[in-house]
């Protein structure tokens, strides 16, 4: 957090932007949107070995309780409207992590008639995590990159 100054009486001064962004990075609640084998790696990231709870990250089942969506796996044309509907139900500010080659660009099924060639055609994506399937460490790195991106944003319009 960008502490601007510490005064004699024990007060700390900082900007409101850095305080709000610090709170947002410390309490990200992702919603799982597991569509294929990448979801298994996403579950492993939330388990005891990597323990996302230490970062304040708690998986939520409802889009109304989440601010991060992790799209993991192959997105088919039939599932695309459901993805958009769930994204629209999330409260602002909201972020999207695209996990795996299939979610990033269609992956192995890129030339199939029924596969969306990247979930960024349906929802805006903030972080892309490559791999087929990406490891739990790669997803953890993507989450940390999203936290860094949130820290750099301006919250209050000037």
Swiss-Prot record:
Enzyme class: translocase
Cofactor(s) this protein cannot do without: [4Fe-4S] cluster
Reactions mediated catalytically: a quinone + NADH + 5 H(+)(in) = a quinol + NAD(+) + 4 H(+)(out)
Enzyme Commission no: 7.1.1.-
Any one GO MF annotation of this record: NADH dehydrogenase (ubiquinone) activity
InterPro entries the UniProt entry points to: NADH_UbQ_OxRdtase-like_20kDa, NADH_UQ_OxRdtase_20Kd_su
GO cellular component: plasma membrane; respiratory chain complex I
Binding residue positions for [4Fe-4S] cluster: 37-38, 102, 132
UniProt xrefs under PROSITE patterns: COMPLEX1_20K
UniProt key word NAD: yes
Similarity remark: Belongs to the complex I 20 kDa subunit family.
UniProt-recorded name of the protein: NADH-quinone oxidoreductase subunit B
Originating organism: Nitrosomonas europaea (strain ATCC 19718 / CIP 103999 / KCTC 2705 / NBRC 14298)
Organism placement in taxonomy: Bacteria, Pseudomonadati, Pseudomonadota, Betaproteobacteria, Nitrosomonadales
